[in-house]
């Protein structure tokens, strides 16, 4: 009996755990602190800083099953998903990693044992082929001599991509940095499937499928192309879970493995489809995986960056559901079946299920309003095509008006053997794309970050003042030996009480000082293992190795820590009030206020906001001790500690506990007791995106200041309405009622005035070619009264052309009315356009009524004088 996908995942992790590897949980699909990546797309992403030497772990061997998304940017597989056997937007990457521990021999031996061992995957040895980099004799000989693979099944692959070291079998992180050769393992599905071994002319066939890539990081590539050996070579491997599942379950397509079979059945059930071989079922089954996990990890559909990629995937799935005959919203209904088939790998998704379903349902309902009309327009345009390519302007119009991502339009065209002019589409999109680029941090050069070789010992949990030594200085991003008065710089110390910004808490400010220099710290940031103090030298000269007195701004620090502790109470109160789907999606904690973003699918009701506020204040009054404990990450999770969105944790973590009310992982600085917070007041609750709400609040001194401000405002209002704060509501209601009554009376007077004006005006009408024409400039008449006057004059004159104008605040207001019997000859919209352009304005309307505005008051008399000739020319 073949292994299930869940069993394969667990077997991989168990195998490497037995080989001394730390099992590390999958990181978020939103890369942490890496601006070069749109989404996590490989197992090594979460270890990138380790490979770069910017981070250290307590272990030197690790294994993971990493959730990955490839859709958008360099790794854009979207158009192929559902149409090929192995393309996905979402997949799991099984990996094992060595950080300066074992190297080629053990990495290859481990892979072979797992793949062929009877108690593990037990694959036939004769079915396995391998490739190595052309000059990697060491790996070649390990495969041939130690493992015993026949040399005819070991293929050397050289530089096949146009330049030195540009090869399928040579991996590099970038133009510079860690790199090295790799060896790949292929499975031969048999001669009943077309294709040749890697390196052959038929290598793109489906017979020989790559199942494992093992990268040997042994060089550090310099900017001049020189390859310097790394002092501690490392290993990074990746094996697609879905690919190895297809091999072990004896199927040729990833969509035939147990996980996808069950998902495809669920898709068929919610859409009413009967043909289980439909490619649309495969598209939807794939897309629910990426969409659900992306939303769970904090990505929300939008028109920019990650949110736009998510929106494209969702809308592609919805369109394929439409093709299958789905008549109502269906996509969100697949979250529950997805959780069922993913098993333990979906534990975090299960906690967010209600929120994920709501976001998907809302997005589907919004798109459904335009999908049918957009498809009708596309059908119409395609029916008029004389060639085989839809122009880019039409593709852009579908995107701009109906929300059709270009790949959805390309999907429709593909089914009709047509293409889309994507270059033309990109040209039409340039303004939006430029705006997105300017507002995003993607594409930043990772190497531009300050590289600090030293580490800083943080002492700020217990101290706000400390003697320290300057270990590094940076000016304009470059390391220097000294800085001088007036210069801005980053100062790194061997130990510091200053907190570096992280976890939503802003960095400390304060002062670094000795007998000869004073450095004003405006911010504190983390640089790998070092803590950098950003600011300006206000006096003297500061050099590396100088002793320094580090003093945190204590008053500011105290306000920050109270706000930070309040966010934990707020988080717990929200979960107790709204449900367990609530999860932190971001925060800002500074000395003035706190901002807390969380997952929830609708605006909070006023009574819910009050309940949350009361609950937090109750915990403050309980004056519970705020306790911290350092423990293993797994132990903390077993204790029920919640991890915060987007935060990266070490193996040893700080667990913050506030009585029995809140337990979370947090490395920030906090109050000693909840009572220190004093008071908590919510300023606002709002939405930032679909499925994401935001609360802003103040504590302590800030909350008291808010109460004083509100009290002063009440006193001012009470004075204005000649009452007191005890009966203020009644007084305000009385004032509003009287105001409404006076407004009604005023409107009645204005109507009477307009009627009187109209009655007197009607006698001024003159005959032009037998038609009554009335042209008049009115004084002291509000622009909004002109329409009422035109209607009155039409009734009085019977058949007529009426032009009225008034001025106010150096602006012209115009209106033209034409009775319906005359609109075949004189159209109000045409007449007013002629008048408006003379007074520096524009306008329009129906043939019988049109309005306009202008800015040239001085030109109004001559413009009105021209009306008679214009009308005469039309009659």
UniProtKB/Swiss-Prot annotation:
<keyword id="KW-0067">ATP-binding</keyword>
<keyword id="KW-0820">tRNA-binding</keyword>
<dbReference type="GO" id="GO:0002161">
    <property type="term" value="F:aminoacyl-tRNA deacylase activity"/>
</dbReference>
<dbReference type="GO" id="GO:0004813">
    <property type="term" value="F:alanine-tRNA ligase activity"/>
</dbReference>
<keyword id="KW-0694">RNA-binding</keyword>
<keyword id="KW-0479">Metal-binding</keyword>
<dbReference type="InterPro" id="IPR002318">
    <property type="entry name" value="Ala-tRNA-lgiase_IIc"/>
</dbReference>
<keyword id="KW-0963">Cytoplasm</keyword>
<comment type="subunit">
    <text>Homotetramer.</text>
</comment>
<dbReference type="InterPro" id="IPR023033">
    <property type="entry name" value="Ala_tRNA_ligase_euk/bac"/>
</dbReference>
<dbReference type="InterPro" id="IPR018162">
    <property type="entry name" value="Ala-tRNA-ligase_IIc_anticod-bd"/>
</dbReference>
<dbReference type="GO" id="GO:0006419">
    <property type="term" value="P:alanyl-tRNA aminoacylation"/>
</dbReference>
<dbReference type="InterPro" id="IPR018165">
    <property type="entry name" value="Ala-tRNA-synth_IIc_core"/>
</dbReference>
<dbReference type="GO" id="GO:0045892">
    <property type="term" value="P:negative regulation of DNA-templated transcription"/>
</dbReference>
<protein>
    <recommendedName>
        <fullName>Alanine--tRNA ligase</fullName>
        <ecNumber>6.1.1.7</ecNumber>
    </recommendedName>
</protein>
<dbReference type="InterPro" id="IPR003156">
    <property type="entry name" value="DHHA1_dom"/>
</dbReference>
<keyword id="KW-0436">Ligase</keyword>
<dbReference type="GO" id="GO:0005829">
    <property type="term" value="C:cytosol"/>
</dbReference>
<dbReference type="Pfam" id="PF01411">
    <property type="entry name" value="tRNA-synt_2c"/>
</dbReference>
<dbReference type="GO" id="GO:0005524">
    <property type="term" value="F:ATP binding"/>
</dbReference>
<feature type="binding site">
    <location>
        <position position="564"/>
    </location>
    <ligand>
        <name>Zn(2+)</name>
    </ligand>
</feature>
<dbReference type="InterPro" id="IPR018163">
    <property type="entry name" value="Thr/Ala-tRNA-synth_IIc_edit"/>
</dbReference>
<dbReference type="InterPro" id="IPR009000">
    <property type="entry name" value="Transl_B-barrel_sf"/>
</dbReference>
<feature type="binding site">
    <location>
        <position position="670"/>
    </location>
    <ligand>
        <name>Zn(2+)</name>
    </ligand>
</feature>
<keyword id="KW-0648">Protein biosynthesis</keyword>
<dbReference type="InterPro" id="IPR045864">
    <property type="entry name" value="aa-tRNA-synth_II/BPL/LPL"/>
</dbReference>
<dbReference type="GO" id="GO:0000049">
    <property type="term" value="F:tRNA binding"/>
</dbReference>
<dbReference type="GO" id="GO:0008270">
    <property type="term" value="F:zinc ion binding"/>
</dbReference>
<keyword id="KW-0862">Zinc</keyword>
<dbReference type="InterPro" id="IPR050058">
    <property type="entry name" value="Ala-tRNA_ligase"/>
</dbReference>
<dbReference type="InterPro" id="IPR018164">
    <property type="entry name" value="Ala-tRNA-synth_IIc_N"/>
</dbReference>
<dbReference type="Pfam" id="PF02272">
    <property type="entry name" value="DHHA1"/>
</dbReference>
<dbReference type="InterPro" id="IPR012947">
    <property type="entry name" value="tRNA_SAD"/>
</dbReference>
<comment type="similarity">
    <text>Belongs to the class-II aminoacyl-tRNA synthetase family.</text>
</comment>
<dbReference type="Pfam" id="PF07973">
    <property type="entry name" value="tRNA_SAD"/>
</dbReference>
<feature type="binding site">
    <location>
        <position position="568"/>
    </location>
    <ligand>
        <name>Zn(2+)</name>
    </ligand>
</feature>
<feature type="binding site">
    <location>
        <position position="666"/>
    </location>
    <ligand>
        <name>Zn(2+)</name>
    </ligand>
</feature>
<comment type="function">
    <text>Catalyzes the attachment of alanine to tRNA(Ala) in a two-step reaction: alanine is first activated by ATP to form Ala-AMP and then transferred to the acceptor end of tRNA(Ala). Also edits incorrectly charged Ser-tRNA(Ala) and Gly-tRNA(Ala) via its editing domain.</text>
</comment>
<keyword id="KW-0547">Nucleotide-binding</keyword>
<keyword id="KW-0030">Aminoacyl-tRNA synthetase</keyword>
């Amino acid at each position: 009996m073949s292994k299930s996908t869940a069993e394969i995942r667990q077997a991989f992790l168990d195998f490497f755990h037995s080989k001394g590897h730390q099992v590390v949980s999958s990181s978020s699909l939103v890369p942490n602190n890496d601006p070069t990546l749109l989404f996590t797309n490989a197992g090594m992403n979460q270890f990138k800083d380790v490979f770069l030497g910017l981070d250290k772990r307590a272990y030197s061997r690790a294994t993971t099953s990493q959730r990955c998304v490839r859709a958008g940017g360099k790794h854009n597989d979207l158009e192929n998903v559902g149409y090929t056997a192995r393309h996905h937007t979402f997949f799991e990457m099984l990996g094992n990693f060595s950080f300066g521990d074992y190297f080629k021999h053990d990495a290859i031996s481990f892979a072979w044992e797992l793949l062929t061992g009877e108690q593990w995957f037990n694959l036939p040895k004769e079915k396995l082929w391998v490739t190595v980099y052309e000059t990697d004799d060491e790996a070649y000989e390990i495969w041939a001599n130690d493992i015993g693979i026949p040399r005819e099944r070991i293929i050397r692959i050289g530089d096949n991509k146009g330049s030195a070291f540009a090869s399928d079998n040579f991996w590099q992180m970038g133009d510079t940095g860690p790199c090295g050769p790799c060896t790949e393992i292929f499975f031969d599905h048999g001669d009943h499937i077309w294709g040749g071994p890697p390196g052959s002319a038929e290598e793109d066939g489906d017979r020989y499928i790559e199942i494992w890539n093992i990268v040997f990081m042994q060089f550090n590539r310099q900017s001049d192309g020189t390859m310097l050996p790394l002092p501690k070579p490392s290993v990074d491997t990746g094996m697609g879970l879905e690919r190895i599942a297809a091999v072990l379950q004896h199927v040729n397509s990833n969509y035939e493995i147990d996980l996808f079979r069950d998902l495809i059945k669920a898709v068929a059930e919610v859409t009413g489809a009967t043909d289980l071989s439909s490619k649309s079922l495969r598209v939807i089954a794939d897309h629910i995986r990426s969409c659900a996990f992306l939303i769970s990890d904090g990505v929300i559909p939008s028109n920019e960056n990650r949110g736009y990629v998510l929106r494209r995937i969702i809308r592609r799935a919805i369109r394929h559901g439409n093709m299958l005959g789905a008549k109502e919203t269906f996509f969100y209904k697949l979250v529950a079946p997805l959780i069922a088939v993913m098993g333990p790998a979906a534990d975090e998704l299960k906690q967010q299920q209600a929120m994920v379903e709501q976001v998907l349902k809302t997005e589907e309902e919004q798109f459904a309003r335009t999908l049918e009309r957009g498809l009708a327009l596309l059908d119409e345009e395609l029916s008029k095509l004389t060639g085989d390519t839809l122009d880019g302007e039409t593709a852009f119009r579908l995107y701009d008006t109906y929300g059709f991502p270009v790949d959805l339009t390309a999907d429709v065209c593909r089914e009709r053997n047509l293409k889309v002019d994507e270059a033309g589409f990109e040209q039409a999109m340039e303004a939006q794309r430029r705006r997105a680029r300017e507002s995003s941090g993607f594409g930043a050069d990772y190497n531009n970050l300050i590289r600090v070789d030293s580490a800083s010992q943080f002492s700020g949990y217990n101290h706000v003042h400390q003697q320290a030594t300057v270990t590094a200085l940076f000016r304009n991003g470059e390391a220097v030996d000294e800085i001088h008065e007036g210069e801005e710089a980053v100062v790194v110390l061997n130990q510091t009480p200053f907190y570096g910004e992280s976890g939503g808490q802003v960095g400390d400010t304060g002062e670094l000082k000795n007998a000869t220099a004073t450095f004003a710290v405006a911010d504190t940031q983390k640089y790998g293992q070092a803590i950098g103090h950003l600011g300006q030298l206000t006096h003297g000269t500061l050099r590396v190795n100088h002793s320094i007195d580090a003093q945190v701004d204590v008053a500011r620090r105290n306000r920050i820590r109270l706000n930070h502790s309040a966010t934990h109470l707020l988080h717990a109160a929200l979960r107790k009030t709204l449900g367990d789907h609530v999860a932190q999606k971001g925060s800002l904690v500074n000395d003035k206020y706190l901002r807390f973003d969380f997952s929830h699918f609708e605006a909070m009701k006023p009574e819910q906001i009050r309940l949350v506020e009361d609950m937090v204040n109750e915990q403050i009054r309980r004056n519970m001790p705020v306790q911290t404990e350092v423990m293993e990450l797994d132990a903390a999770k077993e204790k029920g500690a919640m991890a915060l969105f987007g935060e990266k944790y070490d193996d040893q973590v700080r667990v913050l506990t506030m009585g029995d009310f809140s337990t979370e992982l947090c490395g920030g600085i906090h109050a000693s007791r909840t009572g220190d917070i004093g008071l908590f007041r919510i300023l606002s609750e709002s939405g930032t995106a679909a499925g994401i709400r935001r609360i802003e609040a103040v504590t302590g001194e800030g909350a008291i200041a808010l109460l004083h401000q509100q009290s002063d405002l009440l006193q001012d209002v009470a004075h204005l309405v000649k009452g007191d704060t005890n009966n203020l509501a009644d007084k305000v209601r009385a004032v509003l009622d009287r105001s409404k009554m006076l407004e009604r009376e005023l409107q009645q007077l204005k109507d009477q005035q307009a009627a009187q004006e109209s009655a007197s005006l009607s006698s001024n009408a003159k005959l032009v070619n037998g038609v009554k024409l009335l042209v008049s400039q009115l004084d002291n008449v509000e622009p909004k009264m002109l329409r009422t006057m035109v209607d009155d004059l039409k009734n009085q004159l019977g058949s007529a052309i009426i032009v009225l104008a008034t001025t106010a605040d150096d602006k012209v207001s115009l209106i033209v009315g034409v009775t319906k019997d005359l609109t075949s000859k004189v159209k109000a919209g045409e007449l007013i356009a002629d008048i408006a352009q003379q007074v520096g304005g524009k306008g329009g309307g129906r043939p019988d009524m049109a309005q306009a505005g202008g800015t040239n008051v001085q030109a109004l008399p001559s413009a009105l004088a021209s009306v008679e000739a214009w009308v005469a020319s039309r009659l």
